[in-house]
Structure formats: structure tokens, C-alpha cells
């Protein structure tokens, strides 16, 4: 009997380790696909297709995932706009509207009302959400020119400015 308990414990431990290993490798792969992440094609508020790598040029991209109906996003948005101005020579800020609930017309109204001038894209099919493992909004992700994630934070501005100025 004692031997069976030990075997069950070993099997349970093996299962836990295997689960953690598989989950970790999935999350790592999702966030380190190199150039593939930059090859995503989304649409802008006018319906024009835009590839992320075309926007970046030789600068990193600061991707801001948000939605008009998201209250925390409304609080964060002015801070992101300030970062876009302050670090315009270091990074290109791109807003990515997610969730599929906002129409392009609603997004344009929101941008105009809030005087948002940085590039805005729409992720209708959650391609970017999946590629960048976005689980909640608002979130900011800093990606270098090759698609490597440099910064990924669900509490968007806590450490980002320190990271950008360093």
C-alpha cells in the first residue's frame, strides 16, 4: 500500500511538472517569435491595411491595447499620449483597439474628442491580442524592430517610463 501512494505522488508530481513545462514553453513561444510578430496586418480607422513592421521603420513600437468602453483605458490614454510626445524620437506609439465592440466611427469620435494623434489600428479578429498574449486591457507592449518583446506590462505605466529613459 505504501508503495502505491508513492507511485501516485510521483505521477501527480510528474503531471504538475509536465503541465508547467508545456504552459511555460507556450507562453515563451508566444512572446518571442521574432519578426513574425511584426508581420501582423491590421486595419487603421479608415479601413486601410497596415503591417506593424511598416510602421516601425527603425524604431521600436510601443503597442497600446485598449477599447473605448474600458474605463481604465480612458484613464491611461492621456498618459500614453504624453509618452508618445515625450519619446517621439525613440519609439513609435501605436494604439490597437481590441474587443470588436467599437466601430471605426466610434473610434474616430473618441480619438477626435480626446485629441489623440498617434497611429490607431483596429484588431477586429484578435490577431494581435493572441500574438502578443494580451489577457486584459489596457496593456502596453514595447517591441523592437525585429519583433522581440522588450516590455510587457498589464499595469501599463508603472515601469515603462523608467525603461524608456534608461
Please annotate each region the language model reported.
Residues 53-70:
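Short active-site neighborhood of thiol/selenol oxidoreductases, capturing the structured segment around
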Residues 27-53:
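N-terminal "domain-start" segment that seeds a small globular fold
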Residues 112-116, 124-164:
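Thiol/disulfide oxidoreductase modules built on the thioredoxin-like
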Residues 15-23:
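Bacterial N-terminal signal peptides
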Residues 65-82:
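Conserved redox-active cysteine motifs that mediate thiol-disulfide chemistry
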Residues 4-14:
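Bacterial N-terminal signal peptides that target proteins for export
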Residues 75, 85-125, 137:
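Conserved segment of the thioredoxin-like fold in thiol-based oxidoreductases
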Amino acid at each position: 500500500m505504501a508503495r502505491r501512494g508513492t507511485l501516485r505522488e510521483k505521477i501527480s508530481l510528474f503531471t504538475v511538472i509536465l503541465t508547467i513545462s508545456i504552459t511555460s514553453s507556450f507562453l515563451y513561444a508566444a512572446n518571442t517569435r521574432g519578426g513574425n510578430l511584426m508581420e501582423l496586418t491590421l486595419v487603421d480607422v479608415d479601413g486601410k491595411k497596415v503591417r506593424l513592421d511598416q510602421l516601425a521603420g527603425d524604431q521600436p513600437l510601443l503597442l497600446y491595447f485598449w477599447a473605448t468602453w474600458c474605463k481604465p483605458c480612458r484613464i491611461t490614454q492621456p498618459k500614453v499620449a504624453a509618452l508618445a510626445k515625450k519619446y517621439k524620437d525613440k519609439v513609435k506609439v501605436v494604439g490597437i483597439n481590441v474587443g470588436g465592440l467599437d466601430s471605426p466611427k466610434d473610434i474616430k469620435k473618441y480619438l477626435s474628442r480626446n485629441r489623440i494623434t498617434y497611429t490607431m489600428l483596429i484588431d477586429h479578429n484578435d490577431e494581435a491580442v493572441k500574438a502578443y498574449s494580451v489577457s486584459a486591457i489596457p496593456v502596453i507592449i514595447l517591441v523592437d524592430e525585429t519583433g522581440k518583446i522588450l516590455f510587457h506590462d498589464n499595469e501599463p505605466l508603472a515601469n515603462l517610463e523608467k525603461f524608456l529613459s534608461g
